Amino acid sequence: MKYILLLLLTLNLIAQDDYSLRLAYGNATSSTLGDVVIGDIQNHDYDFTVLSLDGGYLLKENALNWPMDIYVKGGLSHFDDSDYAKASSADIYEATIYLKAYWNFDFLDNRVRLGAGEGISYTSDILSVELLEDETESKSNFLNYIDLSVDFDFGRLISYKPMHNTYIGFALKHRSGIFGLINSVTSGGSNYTTVYLEKNF
């Protein structure tokens, strides 16, 4: 009997369409957070890459009666720092947990979302891009995490209902010490620009 109840509960949760899964890939940029936001994105001198998988759960739909959805999210990332000979490690892993809000714009039978997330990031080693930022600056595995994104519903674009709520987009992964508030990291940090595929289910 308990297995039947567990199955029914699982099916009910799936039917609620409250989950998200995002696969992203990108590169480090030498641009600051502000520069990336205004579209001034410069390639880093080294080919540092990231591959990440983020899962989310919808906490509130249309929060405050606005077209804004709130998710709690967690992610795992792999950073490839092998392009830098002095890297502390060629393979570095990251875990993140954060709250993210999406502002929804519905027009022309499609949906565009602007997303902003805030949370924490922990890496298995110090990222090479952070070591190169300022070699005299304090470093930390544990830093503040910001996730900014813009995407559109690919399923609606091609008018294929089974792929509705499948988003293609651009995201920024940002780690920093918030000007010294976290572990005395004042000017270090990293920015990675990524493209991604995200599915709500």
Per-region residue spans from a language model:
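Short loop/turn motifs that connect adjacent beta-strands in outer-membrane beta-barrel proteins
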Residues: A15-D18, K60-M68, N104-R113, G155-I168
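Short glycine/proline- and aromatic-enriched beta-strand/turn motifs that initiate or cap beta-hairpins
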Residues: A15-K60, E198
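Residues that define the transmembrane beta-barrel architecture of outer-membrane proteins
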Residues: D17, D47-L51, S89-I97, N110, ...
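Membrane-embedded beta-strand positions of outer-membrane beta-barrel proteins
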Residues: L21-L23, I70-G74, L114-E118, I168-F170, ...
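Residues on the lipid-exposed face of transmembrane beta-strands in outer-membrane beta-barrel proteins
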Residues: L23, L53-Y57, I97-W103, A116-E118, ...
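Transmembrane beta-strands of outer-membrane beta-barrel pores
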Residues: Y25-S31, Y57-L59, G74-D80, E118-S124, ...
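Predominantly the C-terminal beta-signal and adjacent terminal strand-loop region
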Residues: S30-L33, Y145-F201
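Outer-membrane beta-barrel translocator domains and adjoining extracellular loop/strand segments
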Residues: T32-G39, S82-S88, I126-L132, G180-V185
